[in-house]
UniProtKB/Swiss-Prot annotation, chain A:
Gene that encodes it: CCZ1A
Keyword Signal among UniProt keywords: no
Signal peptide (from-to): none
Name recorded for this polypeptide: Vacuolar fusion protein CCZ1 homolog A
An example Gene Ontology CC term for this record: Mon1-Ccz1 complex
SUBUNIT field: Interacts with MON1.
Localization of this protein: Endosome; Prevacuolar compartment
Originating species: Arabidopsis thaliana (Mouse-ear cress)
Length: 515, 682
């Protein structure tokens, strides 16, 4: 399996700022994050120095989009420019025997995801650095955040891929070829019957008006599927990702069962201490410079911190205890990318239904709004509807394999809405390793074609018969992508395109026209 | 209902109930009696030898009376037979005379003088008998032959009778007996037969002096509201009006209303109970449909109006001509004067002036004085007499609450009321349609509503009060009214289309800036009609898209579309394309919808417009669409300056369209292709 002990060389993950530490002797300044954190500085600097060199060099030829990936003999270096001049680089060891076969874009999406989540909770890194030029604040936030994020990989892998269970607790699993039929950075939607959908939208209107004249945003999930959102596609993806990680009924219940393993690993208890071992200068001096707020570093991705309260609202002490200070200071807040607004986040849960409610923080500062009043309003106006909708959806819900389509192993991605749907993971595991590898390879090809197109919409249709007689298919058209593996050995190409055409007509409203 | 609303207005001109000029006037000289025949709805005026009768339904003051001659003699009461072929006149307490209007034959009926006396009589349409005569010893039921030559006694109901009441509307006769006259034997003589009611007693409070009050016939009122039969009993000691409801096998007291006058009378207009507090000269309106026994509106005087007011606001227009007290007019009306007789359901007979008034409700005034819009809408939706006015008021209220930006929950309730009422009337309407085929002539649909076509299909125009006949086997309401045939009513129900047309489109312009609020309301509206499984004009979806796009709520727009809350249609797809000019995702939704609807031509044209000419051509090839101008693809490809594409398109078109190679288009573009690049082979 694609796992590695955090101590060995198999994974390096760093974030650095090209605008910092440009004079000799101050190189350490540019490091914002490094994993593993206990690596000595010279090694850290050599990784970053190499990356920086490559970026500077490639920028000569392509100033807009510099280096994306470097394939060395034993390692792949994946680059991601998270913000202008703020780079994230992931170095992974290639190892065919352990199954460490990656798709670069899937790895880049990991970088993108952790960055997006960070920005959602703390705002952009550039803004943080500008606010506090020593970088100490940024580092003290990034270290626990990314480490928490990486630790969540173990939990995810446990629930999604049972093959990895043996390694949970010791290893990190990055997305390998086995996850080729899923797309990080997209949301998975629940398909609703029209009358339920109308009920849901009606509930959304109620939720949105829970703060009186002030319009709130909301997002509703059923299990790990999105039911509705009023946020932009990007904000939806980020909040959805977080909710599935930490807030949904599944996340709340699985935490308790698997967390015990993880405590043994690079768990939460160690992180805080390790972050204090962060490489730059003396943390203590930073603390004294920045006053009291540095003592409490908020770690939004910390696991096992959310519980369901009596009133149905989810409670956490990540943002502090409700008893201290103003009653609203302990309410989680996030930033919306689209509007650059800071919002309070309230989560309400009824059985499998999770509702997230977002209210602009400035409204509360102005005294226009009180959280407890909003909570009360939600309970009064919406709880009956929530009850009814949960019942309706549960009744119509086909379970884990609801979106399994017999004979097909597929992934459909809509890049415009950032929505994807795929065969249930339990069904994907029935595919032969060769099939998955072939599809992974095909996706890699499509990725590079897409990146060559530079944001323009590509139109592609590829059907390949792989060694084990599996048909792997990619179809890209006007922002929509379809990937598929058909393991029926005797099919001709004609049969295959027919099969894809039928799939497209039946399940994608004919979006993928096949020749 | 809010009563304080009028307290502020305070003007004597305010009223909820009124009578208006002209009245039906019986200016017959030397008349010596004025009677009302409730079975035939005739106002009867007698002279010593003549009988003048006016039809009161429909109420038309200009109609001339018909005249019959009868022999001279005292007239205690007079009633036309139900086929109007005969006139029965009670001459004394032991004699009734029947006059055949065609043959002029006279039939005398006398009872045993001394031992018993006749209290009254009435005609019946029950299969058993034609005429019932109530005597102190009981009730005799007679059958007449077709020529009215003889009366044949078919049955006698023995009972000691002090007095009785009967209304043809209820077909119910109550025979009072006992010392206090509060024990009743009841019979219903309906078309289904004669039904005997269980014997029952009415409640009477004891007076302070401990004397037992005696109930009189004037204290009882039989009324029909919503097809239910009630008997109202005045209890002067308790100052209460008791309500008894009649079921097939039981009489159940259902609450009491307070009274504020020792003299009291009732009318029923449009299923509303009007209680005239005669001493106080005010009317209180009750709606017995709801369980609450609270009045619909505050007590206000009965007004006299010079002429009918219709669409305009009653308070504003009629102040100068309204008069609550009297004598401003030539008619010399004194409100609630002693000579007034209140005739159920909705007539007032002024014995002094020999005029008949019809009572009207002022729905506008009632709705103006009510603050609870939801119950007001429910109230208005139950109105049938002035269905159109009720409907217009409902539409007005719906518009107003949206324009006033009432909280969405309030508006939701209001919409739910209207949609549920419509749905109910559709269901009830179909039921009645079936019934009409084998029963009475169906009521013509008057004043066809703007949407009459749709209404007729669903049969919603017919009034919702489905008559429950004895024969229909309904266990509950065995008694019921016979009003149906003459109810020329359309329902005030408002179809979703009308709500869209008269509410949403009219508020849309004024609320562009508050599109979020309006979207919330429309969502609730869609939820409401979806719950009732109704359909609505698809233009509401076009409106929804516009509003969502206007407020840039693209995430929701996308959800509305993909979840088919916005039902797919060509118009909707085009609106998406149009709104999608600001947002490519929305535009794609429109394109997807065109494709899903198999609108090949539009889909292909839109694809080419967006520059996806290859995809468009592929689609055209796949679906064998040849209706799209071939030059469109070629021009698009040429404009994109991709000669390879142009060549490919030329080749595909040659295969797709027979004879394409002979067209001038082919030559033009083939020439262009060769000019630009000779290296590309076709």
């Amino acid at each position: 399996m694609a796992s590695m002990s955090s101590g060995d060389e198999s994974l390096r993950l760093c974030m650095f700022d090209l605008r910092r530490g440009q004079t000799e002797g101050q190189e350490l300044e540019k490091i914002l994050f490094f994993y593993p954190a206990d690596l000595d500085f010279s090694t850290q600097l050599s990784v970053i120095g190499l990356s920086e060199g490559l970026i500077t060099f490639t920028r000569l030829f392509s100033p807009e989009a510099a280096c994306e990936v470097i394939e060395a003999e034993r390692h792949s270096h994946v680059f991601y420019e998270a913000e202008p001049d703020i780079w994230m680089v992931m170095v992974v060891e290639k190892n065919k025997e352990t199954g460490a076969i990656w798709r670069i874009d899937a790895l880049r999406r990991v970088l993108k995801e952790v960055h997006s989540l960070f920005v959602m909770f703390h705002g952009s890194i550039r803004a943080l650095i500008e606010k506090e030029p020593t970088g100490g604040l940024t580092r003290s936030l990034l270290y626990p955040f990314i480490t928490d994020y990486l630790s969540t990989f173990q939990i995810w892998s446990l629930s999604e891929d049972c093959c990895c269970e043996f390694f949970v607790g010791k290893k990190l699993q990055l997305p390998t070829f086995r996850e080729t039929l899923r797309e990080r950075g997209t949301v998975q939607m629940l398909t609703l019957a029209r009358d339920t959908a109308v009920e849901v939208q009606s509930l959304v209107q109620v939720l949105d008006s829970c703060a009186g004249s002030l319009r709130c945003h909301s997002m509703i999930l059923f299990q790990d599927l999105l039911v509705s959102t009023t946020l932009s596609a990007d904000d939806t993806v980020d909040l959805f990702t977080f909710a599935v990680m930490r807030l949904t009924s599944k996340a709340l219940s699985s935490d308790t069962s698997s967390w015990s393993y993880l405590r043994k690993g690079p768990g939460s208890s160690e992180i805080s201490s390790r972050s204090n071992l962060a490489p730059v200068g003396s943390i203590d001096s930073l603390h004294s410079r920045n006053g009291n707020n540095m003592h409490h570093v908020i770690r939004p991705l910390q696991n096992d911190k959310w519980t369901k309260g009596k009133d149905g609202f989810l409670i956490t002490d990540i943002w502090g205890l409700e008893t201290g200070g103003s009653p609203d200071s302990a309410i989680p807040t996030i930033w919306l990318q689209q509007t650059q607004e800071r919002m309070y986040l309230l989560a309400y849960q009824h059985k499998s239904l999770t509702l997230l409610l977002l209210m602009p923080t400035n409204a509360i500062v102005n005294g226009d709004l009180s959280i407890s009043a909003v909570k009360q309003q939600v309970i009064e106006d919406a709880s009956l509807r929530i009850l009814k909708i949960e019942e309706n959806i549960s009744r119509g819900w086909g379970g884990e394999n609801a979106y399994h389509i017999k004979g097909y192993r597929y992934l459909v991605v809509d890049n415009d809405t950032k929505v994807s749907r795929s065969s249930p993971s339990g069904k994907v595991t029935t595919l032969a390793k060769e099939s998955l590898l072939a599809l992974n390879k095909l996706r890699e090809e499509v990725d590079s074609e897409k990146s060559r197109a530079k944001g323009q919409e590509k139109d592609m249709e590829i059907c390949i018969r792989a060694k084990n007689n599996v048909w792997v298919i990619a179809r890209v058209t006007r922002g929509k992508e379809l990937y598929m593996a058909l393991e029926k050995g005797s099919d001709t190409l004609l049969d295959t395109t027919d099969a894809v055409g039928r799939f497209s007509n039946r399940y994608c409203s004919g979006a993928f026209l096949m020749d | 209902m809010n009563s304080s609303a009028q307290a502020g207005v305070g003007s004597g001109a305010l009223s909820h109930v009124y009578i208006h000029h002209p009245s039906l006037r019986c200016n017959i000289p030397e008349s010596n009696g004025l009677f009302y025949d409730d079975a035939n709805r005739l106002l009867i005026c007698t002279t010593s030898s003549q009988v003048f009768s006016w039809e009161t339904s429909p109420f038309n003051p200009d109609v001339p009376p018909s005249v019959d001659s009868i022999s001279e003699g005292p007239i205690l009461s007079i009633r036309f037979s139900l086929d109007k072929k005969a006139i029965a006149v009670q001459r004394s307490d032991c004699e009734i005379q029947l006059f055949n209007r065609e043959t002029k034959q006279i039939l005398n009926h006398k009872c045993k003088a001394g031992s018993e006396s006749i209290l009254g009589f009435f005609w019946s349409d029950s299969p058993l008998c034609d005429l019932a005569i109530v005597k102190t010893s009981g009730m005799d039921l007679f059958a007449c032959d077709s020529m009215l030559n003889s009366l044949r006694l078919v049955e006698t109901k023995k009972a000691n009778v002090n007095w009785y009441i009967y209304t043809h509307e209820t077909r119910l006769v109550l025979l009072a007996s006992g010392l206090q006259c509060k024990t009743f034997n009841g019979f219903q003589l309906s078309t289904a037969g004669v039904v005997r009611l269980p014997r029952f007693e009415m409640t009477m409070a004891r007076s302070e002096s401990n004397s037992k009050p005696i109930l009189s016939a004037g204290d009882l009122h039989l009324v029909t509201v919503y097809g239910r039969i009630y008997c109202l009993q005045v209890d002067r000691e308790a100052m209460l009006l008791h309500l008894y409801r009649f079921y097939r096998d039981a009489v159940v007291q259902q609450g009491s209303l307070p009274i504020y006058s020792s003299k009291l009378s009732v009318n029923v207009v449009d299923n509303l109970l009007l209680v005239h507090q005669i001493d106080a000269k005010v009317v209180i309106i009750y709606d017995l449909f709801v369980d609450s026994r609270a009045p619909v509106s505050a007590p206000l005087p009965l007004l006299w109006r010079g002429y009918q007011v219709s669409e305009t606001s009653s308070q504003a227009v009629n102040k100068e001509i309204e008069s609550s007290e009297s004598s401003t007019s030539n008619e010399n009306i004194v409100m609630y004067e002693d000579g007034w007789t209140f005739l159920v359901p909705d007539l007032i007979l002024d014995q002094t002036n020999k005029v008949l008034w019809k009572i009207h409700l002022d729905l506008e005034a009632i709705s103006a004085s009510s603050s609870d819009r939801t119950s007001l809408l429910e109230f208005l939706q139950r109105r049938k007499l002035e269905a159109n006015k009720a409907k217009q008021l409902c539409l007005g209220i719906a518009r107003a609450i949206i324009l006033e930006r009432r909280p969405a929950t309030q508006v939701t309730q209001a919409i739910d009321v209207l949609v549920t009422a419509y749905s109910y009337s559709v269901k009830a309407g179909t039921y009645k349609e079936i019934k009409n085929e084998n029963a009475t002539a169906s009521t013509p649909t008057p004043g066809a509503s703007p949407d009459s076509e749709r209404h007729r299909q669903s049969g919603s125009n017919i009034d919702e009060e489905v008559e429950m006949n004895l024969s229909s086997g309904s266990q509950e309401n065995m008694f019921c009214a016979d009003e149906q045939q003459e109810s020329q009513l359309s329902s005030p129900a408002i179809s979703p289309d009308e709500l869209y047309k008269f509410v949403f489109t009219s508020v849309e312009e004024m609320m562009v800036e508050e599109s979020e609020y309006l979207v919330a309301i429309i969502t609730e509206f869609l939820r409401s009609i979806s719950a009732e499984k109704l359909k609505v004009d698809l233009n509401i979806y076009v409106m929804t898209i516009k509003l969502l796009a206007y407020s840039k709520r693209f995430a929701e727009l996308s959800l509305f579309t993909t979840n088919k809350i916005i039902e797919p249609s060509k118009e909707v797809a085009f609106q998406l394309l149009d709104s999608g000019r600001q947002n490519i995702r929305v535009r794609k939704l429109g394109l997807d919808m065109l494709r899903q609807l198999s609108l090949h031509h539009d889909y292909i044209s839109s694809l080419v417009q967006d520059g996806y000419y290859l995809e468009a051509l592929r689609y055209a090839q796949k679906h064998k669409v040849t209706s799209v101008r071939s030059s469109m693809f070629l021009e698009a490809a040429f404009a994109s300056n991709d000669m390879q594409h142009l060549a490919a398109i030329l080749r595909v078109l040659s295969e797709l369209i027979p004879g394409f190679k002979e067209t001038s288009e082919y030559y033009t573009f083939y020439g262009l292709l060769n000019d630009t690049s000779s290296s590309v082979a076709v």
